Amino acid sequence: MQEIQKNTKKEQYNLNKLQKRLRRNVGEAIADFNMIEEGDRIMVCLSGGKDSYTMLEILRNLQQSAPINFSLVAVNLDQKQPGFPEHILPAYLEQLGVEYKIVEENTYGIVKEKIPEGKTTCSLCSRLRRGILYRTATELGATKIALGHHRDDILQTLFLNMFYGGKMKGMPPKLMSDDGKHIVIRPLAYCREKDIIRFAEAKAFPIIPCNLCGSQPNLQRQVIADMLRDWDKRYPGRIETMFSAMQNVVPSHLCDTNLFDFKGITHGSEVVDGGDLAFDREEIPLQPAGWQPEEDDTSVEALRLDVIEVK
């Protein structure tokens, strides 16, 4: 009995510590990008996955002690995939006492009609979903739309664009929506996926599977995800360093003429960003930039979230 109590206390301690880290990460992102302002009504897009559950939980937690007032409304889009457990999210949100809205739109039928069998449906599905969410935000009077993308998603997108798109473009933590009417925010921008996995497992969120549509997986993104996961295991701190690089861009040392006026450099021009250091031996710090090892940075390969079996 004492051993059980000891384990329970340790688990609670670890959960509290993890929640504080996620709360700190989200708080810093909100402050750095001015994501949430006084009086905001935040529409939290809830898919039923680990990321959106974590985002809602941390925002609710911050709401209690934030120096500003803001409200939350959770929104789920029921796209009418066969077998979608439509009772799960309403029951969960009612138990929490969170305001919510379930939007029912048969985008599944549209996608199946337009996309050949076996082809990736994500692009069309995403466009349809985006338009519905923008419309819903207007109907609810939401001032911000919160999405659950985390740090790993942002890095994956950067490498996807570099490897396959020929662009150095990531996923912005805050942006104006396509229709020019809504501000979209990503409060989990500084959060590590492995922390979210641990948190979701500890909180036992009722995870809904994301493979109900039967679409082919995004193989390119999976390749990038596997690469980053391998780097994280073999070279601790590399992921943090790469993310720091996204926040420390030097346009004069890249090749984009839209970002820097290379033609304007003439005799007598001032030295910019250290000038030409190409022939100097670069001093590389012994510890990766932006990395602080955590006590509980153990492998999460064995962690698996319990997914509700859909019958």
UniProtKB/Swiss-Prot annotation:
Enzyme class: transferase
Listed EC numbers: 2.8.1.-
Gene Ontology BP annotations: tRNA thio-modification
Manner of cofactor binding, per the entry note: Binds 1 [4Fe-4S] cluster per subunit. The cluster is chelated by three Cys residues, the fourth Fe has a free coordination site that may bind a sulfur atom transferred from the persulfide of IscS.
Cell compartment(s), UniProt: Cytoplasm
Entry function: Catalyzes the ATP-dependent 2-thiolation of cytidine in position 32 of tRNA, to form 2-thiocytidine (s(2)C32). The sulfur atoms are provided by the cysteine/cysteine desulfurase (IscS) system.
Stated name of the protein: tRNA-cytidine(32) 2-sulfurtransferase
Organism: Salmonella paratyphi B (strain ATCC BAA-1250 / SPB7)
